[in-house]
């Protein structure tokens, strides 16, 4: 949740309300079977990558492999549609909080999945 708020640029007076709304939306979306299944897929793919069971060098995170972004985009789109897809690119590029931590620890899929989750939920906050 903190990573979602790291990129919040609204007024400080609204910050607590936005954070509470984000929490509510996050909890709701985690029970969405499409979102939760994509999050599970990201975790499983990271596990398979670490075990060298994917058809590319997982540790290099090669440019020609973009399925990790596809997972993040799918999560964002499921939650809040087109606006969340644009917001995903912002979270993916800035990598605030846990997203950056996951990226630095080599979680090729989960960092993008969480970026999609937060981008979608933050987009939903402002509907």
From Swiss-Prot:
Q: Which InterPro entries match?
A: PgpA-like_sf, YutG/PgpA
CDD domains named in the record: PgpA
Q: Which Pfam families match?
A: PgpA
Could you tell me the Gene Ontology terms of the biological process aspect for this record?
lipid metabolic process
Q: Which GO terms describe its molecular function?
A: phosphatidylglycerophosphatase activity
The protein's name in its UniProt record: Uncharacterized protein MJ1330
């Amino acid at each position: 949740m903190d990573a979602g708020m790291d990129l919040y640029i609204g007024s400080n007076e609204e910050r607590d309300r936005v954070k509470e709304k984000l929490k509510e939306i996050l909890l709701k979306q985690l029970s969405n079977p499409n979102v939760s299944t994509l999050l599970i897929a990201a975790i499983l793919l990271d596990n398979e990558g670490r075990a060298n069971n994917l058809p590319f060098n997982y540790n290099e995170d090669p440019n020609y492999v973009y399925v990790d972004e596809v997972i993040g985009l799918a999560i964002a789109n499921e939650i809040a549609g087109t606006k969340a897809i644009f917001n995903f690119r912002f979270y993916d590029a800035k990598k605030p909080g846990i997203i950056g931590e996951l990226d630095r620890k080599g979680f090729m899929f989960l960092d993008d999945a969480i970026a999609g989750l937060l981008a979608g939920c933050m987009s939903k906050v402002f509907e």
